[in-house]
Amino acid sequence: MAVGWFYLSVLALCSLGSMCILFTIYWMRYWHGGFAWDGSMLMFNWHPVLMVTGMVVLYSAASLVYRLPQSWVGPRLPWKSGHAAMHLLAFLLTVLGLHAVFEFHNHAKIPHLYSLHSWLGITTVFLFACQWFLGFSVFLLPWASMWLRSLLKPIHVFFGASILSLAIASVVSGINEKLFFSLKNGTKTYSNLPSEAVFANCAGMLVVVFGLLVLYILLASSWKRPEPGMQAEREPTRTRGRAGTPEVMLEGERGLAEPLLQKRS
């Protein structure tokens, strides 16, 4: 049952994440003319798409790598490398998104970093950069001791969830700000809820629901990878491998691995 709920949640996340990206693309194409890379308003339209894709969807996918049951066994290095690579890709898309909005502001002679949305966003990106550097240097490179990693892991996990929360707040405030700037004239003010406002509000709600589901999976203790030190505290259950060799499975892993064992038998 546990593994079923986990993969059902992953399927829901994939659907919600895709919808968040597609809704943002459609909003920028249908109501704001599409995309370009020339310093115009069409270049700005890349900003929400890249930020939602990088800071929310890809960032969340990278954060959930260690929740996959397949990552609980075998060497950790491939999973660590995948985790770091996905976060790096998310960061690169985020930097492109920032470049798009800064270039548009330069072209249109608009001041930088004056709104609450921009303060939230730049703080989130700064924390993301620090988080990635800390994770790469301490948890991926081999120099750090187990004591140091154990000390920094709770901090790394806390800021991982905090950065996602800040990213969601930045996206929601950015959607709100964009609508206030776009819907100015008397025929389609934001308060009258024209079709663009309804659509963009729905896109924002999708981002919020997506983020809450990601945070739930990250915080659910039954879906976390068991710590190596917990093996001695849990009663091991012996099963038979495919070739008849004994395998040791922790009690906390049995629920997620049960379907695999049934297939083997």
Swiss-Prot record:
> Which residues of the sequence carry a binding annotation for heme b 2?
R67, H83, H156, K224
Q: Tell me yes or no: is Glycoprotein among this UniProt entry's keywords.
A: yes
InterPro entries, sorted = CYB561/CYBRD1-like (IPR043205), Cyt_b561/ferric_Rdtase_TM (IPR006593)
Q: Outline which residue ranges sit on the Lumenal face.
A: 24-45, 105-119, 176-197
Cite the EC number.
7.2.1.3
Location of the protein in the cell: Late endosome membrane; Lysosome membrane
Q: How does it sit in the membrane?
A: Multi-pass membrane protein
Bias (Basic and acidic residues) occurs at 228-238
GO biological process terms held by the UniProt record = intracellular iron ion homeostasis
According to the record, how does the cofactor bind? Binds 2 heme b groups non-covalently.
Q: How is it modified after translation?
A: N-glycosylated.
Instruction: Report residues carrying sugar chains.
Output: N185
Q: Which regions of this chain are Cytoplasmic-facing, per the record's topological domains?
A: 1-2, 67-83, 141-154, 219-265
Membrane-crossing ranges are 3-23, 46-66, 84-104, 120-140, 155-175, 198-218
Signal sequence segment: none
Q: Give the catalytic activity.
A: Fe(3+)(out) + L-ascorbate(in) = monodehydro-L-ascorbate radical(in) + Fe(2+)(out) + H(+)
Q: Which residues bind heme b 1?
A: H47, H112, L113, Y114, S115, H117, E177
Q: Where does L-ascorbate bind?
A: R76, K80, R149
Q: Output the Gene Ontology cellular-component terms.
A: late endosome membrane; lysosomal membrane
Cytochrome b561 domain boundaries: 12-219
Keywords in alphabetical order: Electron transport, Endosome, Glycoprotein, Heme, Iron, Lysosome, Membrane, Metal-binding, Oxidoreductase, Translocase, Transmembrane, Transmembrane helix, Transport
Q: What does this protein do?
A: Transmembrane reductase that uses ascorbate as an electron donor in the cytoplasm and transfers electrons across membranes to reduce iron cations Fe(3+) into Fe(2+) in the lumen of the late endosome and lysosome. Reduced iron can then be extruded from the late endosome and lysosome to the cytoplasm by divalent metal-specific transporters. It is therefore most probably involved in endosomal and lysosomal cellular iron homeostasis.
**Name of this chain's protein:** Lysosomal membrane ascorbate-dependent ferrireductase CYB561A3
Its source organism is Bos taurus (Bovine)
Give the classification, highest ranks.
Eukaryota, Metazoa, Chordata, Craniata, Vertebrata
